[in-house]
């Protein structure tokens, strides 16, 4: 790999703009700044060669530079062909960190970019930071000879965590992994509050549509679906939920949402959002019953929720309105507006989640990398969680920015509750 390019980005000339954006983001990411303050001197990640596969955004750039400040060598690719922010990638490349990512990669280029991150000047990767599982899967299937040298995987998102548990159940997983997604300060913040803001940003930038008065259909009522439903309702839409899980369906109903099937909802909706992480959510028979100019988008990790293939094969006309916005005309004369080719709408059509909420998620990522690198004996092959105490530390690091003042337990109160005055304050089974 000695002839490897030092980086490949869309335009290195965007680096100065990217650096300005990073400077602003750092002020909105107190958790990562706390990590730098605590650990930049001791360098707990010294010797770690981290291959990262996660959306190459401004916020991710702050994460990357935090990992480097803590002693790691880092090489990076994006986990989605549309999610790279080219100015952020340029800033990281200009800083001398190998990054292989640009907005609008082909599927072949996407794989090439990931493969560039596997070998460092001193040897192959020994840590994985993944989002969605593509890097994890690639190494397990195509580069299994590298597995023995890898200490751990930290996985960012719901889809990637599902993949890890599936691999574990099938006896395929060969490396210890930490499920970052299900840290409370990730899933209950990034998935919920992040989507609550970035979904609307993506839809508005793509279409300028008026949401008030429309009928919006949200497929799935997990944390992501909850955030999306709140956002659409907040803008004045009447929101319909589809669900497979009776508990989530009951939650949605108790919040005042109508809950029905996609076969029924497809006839009513003006805006459709898939959030499930599953396949075949919106199919050809649904498109055929939709209203004219229905807007269809996805905020789950992969492009498998919406049957884009059916649209491409059955529409009589496809018109590209602008990048990541396509209008299909069906045989019945009605049009469908598809955003980001069925991939992540908030990153394909907008800038993704705000920096502050990503600081929660990425502080968990840094902690997971430190845990796996410095305490390998604690983590056998399997899927693990960060300790509750670290979850609480992530939250605490973000309180000052919001002027939050915590109440401190008295010694008497702590004894009454049977806990330390310093936490952890909830048992592991507590759901928040």
From Swiss-Prot:
Compartments in which it is found: Cytoplasm; Melanosome; Nucleus; Endoplasmic reticulum
* Keywords for the protein's UniProt record, in alphabetical order: Acetylation, Copper, Cytoplasm, Endoplasmic reticulum, Hydrolase, Hydroxylation, NAD, Nucleus, One-carbon metabolism, Phosphoprotein
Q: Which GO terms describe its cellular component?
A: cytosol; endoplasmic reticulum; melanosome; nucleus
Q: Which residues carry this modification: N-acetylserine?
A: 2
Indicate where the modification Phosphotyrosine is found in the sequence: 193
Query: Modified residue N6-(2-hydroxyisobutyryl)lysine is at which positions?
Result: 186
Cofactor field: NAD(+)
> What Enzyme Commission number(s) apply to this enzyme?
3.13.2.1
Q: Which GO terms describe its biological process?
A: one-carbon metabolic process; S-adenosylmethionine cycle
Asked if DNA repair is a keyword of the record, the answer is: no
What does the record give as the reaction this protein catalyses? S-adenosyl-L-homocysteine + H2O = L-homocysteine + adenosine
Presence of the UniProt keyword Cytoplasm in the record? yes
Q: What does this protein do?
A: Catalyzes the hydrolysis of S-adenosyl-L-homocysteine to form adenosine and homocysteine. Binds copper ions.
Q: Which family does it belong to?
A: Belongs to the adenosylhomocysteinase family.
Q: Name it.
A: Adenosylhomocysteinase
Protein's organism: Macaca fascicularis
Traced from the root, the source organism's taxonomic lineage reads: Eukaryota, Metazoa, Chordata, Craniata, Vertebrata
């Amino acid at each position: 790999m000695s002839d490897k390019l030092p980086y490949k980005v869309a335009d290195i000339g965007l680096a100065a703009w990217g650096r300005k954006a990073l400077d602003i983001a750092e002020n909105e990411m107190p958790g990562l700044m706390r990590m730098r303050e605590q650990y930049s001197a001791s360098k707990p990640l010294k010797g770690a060669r981290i291959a990262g596969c996660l959306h190459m955004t401004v916020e991710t750039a702050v994460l990357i530079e935090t990992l480097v400040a803590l002693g790691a060598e880092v090489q990076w690719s994006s986990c989605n062909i549309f999610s790279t922010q080219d100015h952020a990638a340029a800033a990281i490349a200009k800083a001398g960190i190998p990054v292989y990512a640009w907005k609008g990669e082909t599927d072949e280029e996407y794989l090439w970019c990931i493969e560039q991150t596997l070998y460092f000047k001193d040897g192959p990767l020994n840590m994985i930071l993944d989002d969605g599982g593509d890097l994890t899967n690639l190494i397990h299937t195509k580069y299994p000879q590298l597995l023995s040298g890898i200490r751990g995987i930290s996985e960012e998102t719901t889809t990637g965590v599902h993949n890890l548990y599936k691999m574990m159940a099938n006896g395929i997983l060969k490396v210890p992994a930490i499920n970052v997604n299900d840290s409370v300060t990730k899933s209950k913040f990034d998935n919920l509050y992040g989507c609550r803001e970035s979904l609307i940003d993506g839809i508005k930038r793509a279409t300028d549509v008026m949401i008030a008065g429309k009928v919006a259909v949200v497929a799935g009522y997990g944390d992501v679906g909850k955030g999306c439903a709140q956002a659409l309702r907040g803008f004045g839409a009447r929101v319909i939920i589809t669900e497979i899980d009776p508990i989530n369906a009951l939650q949605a109903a108790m919040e005042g949402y109508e809950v029905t099937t996609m076969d029924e909802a497809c006839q009513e909706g003006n805006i459709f959002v898939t959030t499930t992480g599953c396949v075949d959510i919106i199919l050809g028979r649904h498109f055929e019953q939709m209203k004219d100019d229905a807007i269809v988008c996805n905020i789950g990790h992969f492009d498998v929720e919406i049957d884009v293939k059916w649209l491409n094969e059955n529409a009589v006309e496809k018109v590209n309105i602008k990048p990541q916005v396509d209008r299909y005309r069906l045989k019945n004369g009605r049009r469908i507006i598809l955003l980001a080719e069925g991939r992540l709408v908030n990153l394909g059509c907008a800038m993704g989640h705000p920096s502050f909420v990503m600081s929660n998620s990425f502080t968990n990522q840094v902690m997971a990398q430190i845990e796996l690198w410095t305490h390998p004996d604690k983590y056998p092959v399997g899927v693990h969680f960060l300790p509750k105490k670290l979850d609480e530390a992530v939250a605490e690091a973000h309180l000052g920015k919001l002027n939050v003042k915590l109440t401190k337990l008295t010694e008497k109160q702590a004894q009454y509750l049977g806990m330390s005055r310093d936490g952890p304050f909830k048992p592991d089974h507590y759901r928040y």
